């Protein structure tokens, strides 16, 4: 049995006569060789490496083809597939955005090998019904992939003919989705989970071997580790490292600990790597799709061995933990910190819940080489946090940011999500003001557009997606679901791709782009005035943190435009001038915050926003036809308000959990018919993740 595991890239496709081609098929895009410059670095196919390790532990041998990072054209795919001649292919789609390429690759495989088994895994299998019916896929794996994939191989060994399925045998394997003998979707529940003791770290040598054999070079393995000198944060990182080292040296004088001095210049020549210390997430955010259930941590001994390997083999001096939910296990978090210090590497951690740590924890982590921590906050409005089911308060976030600032830990509240059901002008103002308060606390300037905000996108397998279907915003037929996935793949997180789930008009929602920034900057200015009794201090801070920062931001935006003009604008001077004038006018309106009251400036901003929206609508809206699945989509007037998140519905909720979008979706579901058929029950498993 020849087994091939492939990482599948996200990205849209251009449809041509006779075949599906990747976007930009005329260009060679390769994350390793950088034949087209990219600000991104390759991401190791961790899921694929995990599955192949478990396969080998159970007596199977397989090959890896890193399609995600190599980005081959169809001709290269065909050449490699013919070289390997697989009998079983596993396609790993970690995002719903991978759907077009899942379809493309499966089609090529079926054309080449009519009898090949095609198995799809990853978060994308929340759309299993669509994948099984609209692509050449035979089976989907729902949940953790290791155990069910090996059981599929066991099944194929006994039943090699893919056209003659033993439905009874397949039904005994947990974690599968397939089309049964009655042409109905069958989901056998979520898969068995590997126990924590069996979690393994990726074998980069296996990936290196794959790159050497299939479309790349073995030395490209080093591209997974970014040189720190290329990081925009290198100076800040070195400053924190110096602080940590000085503290350790002072402690050494008292406790006689053996402390190794850190050479800052040496650190600049190190590389940054990634490591997982846990698997899964304890949270249930209503916008987030999580196919992996439960929460497990890696063994401390295995972590230490892996960290030392990365340090010695790949010159890694700075590690980023890539956990979905770091520090949820307090005991394990302390073990991780001790290992990092023992191994002599500095580290950062993102995806931390603000309620998972306190001041003493942060202090301990800082003493054990933690440089940076990222908290996911999503909104500065308590109403929106409750709808997202974040289960913390914005005061919790503020307190953690304050403690990090006091301890000298670089921290970044992760990107804001705007436009969820229940979002209003008031909640957007709250978010802008909250971002301003955190930036003021951290002695930063007033650019509250950082961290960047993204518009909420409904991903299959989330309450947000089901809510959109309940309200007629996303269709329920296979063709409509496929059209939606193709659309969000093309536009991703842009405003144009956003489906308005709020009570406000599209024009009003577009204005929120500006409202968040302007309300935040007004709040920032007010904080300066309230915190400084001296007029001189007020003027100095307003100049340094507002006016000067705005000028620098304008210059930086111009620099970016001119660097990209040959690629994006193709020398069209008029278009460049229009964009420059637009940037200049927005910056001038920002400066107006320093001199004009809200009652005067905000109506001007709204009028400007409405004018911008008019031209955007005129440019993008399809004439003599209907736009679907974007901001211009005509909403279904036949859907009653009983399914929608309205302010009155939120106000009537007595408990936080009643404001959760999950609760609202469950109530909506009960108002319709309960699942009757086995297929409807299977679809509900995928929709609810249970």
Question: How should these model regions be labeled?
Answer:
Residues 6-8, 65, 92, 121, ...:
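Short hydrophobic segments within beta-strands
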Residues 131-150, 367-375, 434-453:
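Structural recognition of alpha->loop->beta junctions
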Residues 43, 205-413, 418-420, 429-433:
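Radical SAM [4Fe-4S] cluster-binding motif and immediate context
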